[in-house]
Amino acid sequence: MGAGVIGTEFLKGQGLGNQLFSYVTARCIALERGCAFGTAGQEQLAVNIHSKKGMYFMDMDLGERIETGTKDGLAPAAEYGTGTAAADGSGACAARSSGVRKEELRRYDEKELRFFQGTSVHDMEHGCYVAGEDGALHSLPDNTLIYGNMQDERYFARYREQIREWLRVRPEYDTHEFTRDNLCILNLRGGEYTGHPELYLSRGYWLKGMKNMRKIRPDMEFIIVTDDPEAAHKLLPGLPVYHSDLDRDYVMLKNARYLLLSNSSFAFFPAYTSDTLQAAIAPKYWARHNVSDGYWASEQNIYSIFQYQDRSGRLFTPEECRQELEAYKKTSGKYKNAGKRPEGMKAAWCRLESRVRYGMFYLRKIWYSLTRRAGWKVPYGKNVG
C-alpha cells in the first residue's frame, strides 16, 4: 500500500458545504500527521440536487484516488477528475490513482452527541446533533478514512492560508461584481429547511440582522443569494433575489464585504477564504437558533470570523458564545441526559411540544403570506441589481 494515507469520502447527495468541510478537515489532519491525503467518491464532489456539473470552478487537488467498488468491480477512472478542465468546464479537479481500495482502510466515525427532545419530529426520532471537537482526529493512525460532521474550526484553523490556496476559484469565475462598500448579501437557505420550524430562520432574524448591519453603515443596501428564490420572495418581499449557477452563488458570497448568514454550511468557506469580508453575522445557536435555551447545534459551528445574533437581535463574539456554552453545560440537564430517548409521559410531552411548535410555525407562515399580500415589503429594500 505504500506510505500511509488519511482521507475522507464524498457521499452521494451530500451538499457542497458539507463536502468542503470533510475535504478540508481530512486534508489538514493528513498534513498535521505527515500522511498522504486521499479521497473516495470523487465523482460525487459538487454533485447534488442543486448542481450536477461537479467542481468546475476550482482546481481542487483531491489527493490520492481511493477506489470504491461498483457491482462490476472498481468504478471506472473516467468518472473521476482528470486534472484538466473539460471543454464544458467540468472535471477540473486533480486526482492521482493510488491503487488503494476503500475496504483496505480503517473507518473512523467522528464522535457524536445528540439531544432527543420535542423541538421537532427530527429531534425526537434522530436527535439534535450538538457535538464539539473530537480530539481523537488529531491522533488517528495511518490509512484511515474519516466520516462525520467535521466542521470544528480547531481541526483546520492553523492551515487557513493553505486552505485559501486549496479552494482558490479559477480566475474566469472570480468576479467582483457585488463587492461594494455599502452592500450586504443575505445568504438565505430555503429548500428542505422551509418545512422545519427548528431550522428555518424567521423574518425577524433577517430584519434584526439588517438593522445591525445598518449600524455599521447607515446607507447599507441588501440583496439575497439563495437556493430557493420562491421562499426568499415570500419571506422577505422587496429585496432583490439572486440564484444562479453554483460558481456565481459561491463567488458572490466569497467576494462580499458584508454577509448576513443562515445556519447553512454552504457559506462558511466562501467567507473563510475571502479577501474582502469585513463583517459577517450568523445565527446564535446555529441550527437551533429558533428553539435553543443555551445549547448549540452544534458547538462546532462557533467560528472566529462571525458575530452571532440571538433572537432578540443582540450580537455576541465567538468568545462570548463559548463562555456561555461552557457555563450552560455545567447546569443543563440536557447534557446530563444526552443520548437518552424520552420515555413514557416525557415522550408524550415531547410529542405534544413538537406539534405545538409546528402549529405555531405554520401560523407564522400564514401571517407572512397575509402581510405580503397586503403589500408589506422589507423596509431596507432597494434595487441594487
Role assignments for model-derived ranges:
Residues 7-8, 36-42, 185-187, 223-225, ...:
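A structural signal for short, well-ordered beta-strand segments and their strand-loop junctions
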Residues 16, 203-207, 211-300:
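Donor-binding and catalytic core of enzymes assembling or modifying cell-surface/extracellular glycoconjugates
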Residues 4, 48-217, 315-385:
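Secretory-pathway luminal glycosyltransferase catalytic domains
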Residues 267, 272-339:
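Catalytic binding pocket for nucleotide-activated donors in carbohydrate/polymer assembly enzymes
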Residues 10-18, 197-201, 258:
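Conserved aromatic-histidine-acidic binding/catalytic patches
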Residues 18, 39, 45-51, 154-155, ...:
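Short catalytic/ligand-binding loop motif for oxyanion handling, primarily in non-cytosolic enzymes
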Residues 2-49:
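N-terminal pre-catalytic "stem/leader" segment of glycosyltransferase-like enzymes
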